[in-house]
From Swiss-Prot:
Cofactor note: Binds 1 zinc ion per subunit.
Gene giving rise to this polypeptide: queC
The protein's enzyme class: ligase
InterPro entries membership: QueC, Rossmann-like_a/b/a_fold
Alphabetic keyword roster: ATP-binding, Ligase, Metal-binding, Nucleotide-binding, Queuosine biosynthesis, Zinc
Documented EC number(s): 6.3.4.20
Catalytically driven reaction(s): 7-carboxy-7-deazaguanine + NH4(+) + ATP = 7-cyano-7-deazaguanine + ADP + phosphate + H2O + H(+)
Residues annotated as binding ATP: L10, S11, G12, G13, L14, D15, S16, A17, T18, A19, A20
Classification lineage: Bacteria, Bacillati, Cyanobacteriota, Cyanophyceae, Synechococcales
Protein family per UniProt: Belongs to the QueC family.
Pfam families xref list: QueC (PF06508)
Species, as recorded: Synechococcus sp. (strain CC9605)
Sequence positions that bind Zn(2+): C191, C199, C202, C205
Protein name: 7-cyano-7-deazaguanine synthase
């Protein structure tokens, strides 16, 4: 049986690195795909390249899609403050980037079809950031239907399948799995701020640090990061 090929969307963060490592554990030949979309935290792309190398991905590509051209998100527009006080239930946080995952998944599916990849690996999570509309199971299910209809491979019955193993996991479980898999957590980048070091106060940093402490690895928290 030939080795399965998977395209992994790799942001440089903990979740996407863990999802890619899970695909590797299952024996997949993994190709990483990252995006320069005009994000303030461009540092994550350096992390993505380093993670791809350390995990031993077969290839790693970085595509430019400048979503910052029209702003609309705290991650692409410096005039919008990055929240530090938690996600308000029932509201979509300002760190949501309009259409980001729809664009990323579409490009990922294009690469998957061109390379004959059987699945597209996503590190999306609906638990910690349930306010994001494009990180939810119903969104992923609907997109799978679209992908099956919108591609030659899908119409022929062998289109890439969206695989989001972390979608219902807690952050603590993700950290524990990352530790088990040997994911280079210290290399990953989760901070939303555009500095050279994690800020430790944005929602992404706080959720990550809380999970690391609960998992018994406070040494990997942003406050101790180099």
């Amino acid at each position: 049986m030939s080795q399965r090929t998977a395209i992994a969307l790799l942001s440089g963060g903990l979740d996407s690195a863990t999802a890619a490592a899970l695909a590797l554990e299952q024996g997949d030949r993994v190709i990483g795909l990252s995006f320069d979309y005009g994000q303030r935290h461009l540092r994550e792309l350096d992390a993505a390249a380093a993670v791809a190398q350390q995990l031993g991905l077969a290839e790693h590509h970085c595509i430019s899609v400048n979503l910052a051209s029209w702003g609309g998100s705290a991650l692409t527009d410096a005039s919008i403050s990055i929240p530090t006080d938690g996600v308000e239930e029932g509201r979509i946080p300002p760190t949501y980037v309009p259409g980001r995952n729809t664009v990323f998944i579409s490009v990922g599916l294009s690469l998957a079809e061109a390379r004959g990849a059987e699945r597209l690996v996503l590190g999306v999570n609906a638990v910690d950031y349930s306010g994001y509309p494009d990180c939810r199971p119903d969104y992923l299910n609907a997109f799978q239907t679209l992908a099956d209809l919108a591609s030659k491979a899908g119409r022929e019955g062998h289109g890439a399948q969206l695989w989001a193993p972390l979608v219902q996991w807690s952050k603590v479980r993700i950290v524990e799995e990352a530790l088990r898999l040997g994911v280079p957590i210290e290399t990953t980048w989760s901070c939303y701020s555009g500095g050279t070091h994690p800020c430790g106060v944005c929602d992404s940093c706080r959720i990550r640090d809380a999970a690391l402490r609960e998992a018994g690895r406070p040494d990997l928290c942003s406050s101790t990061a180099a």
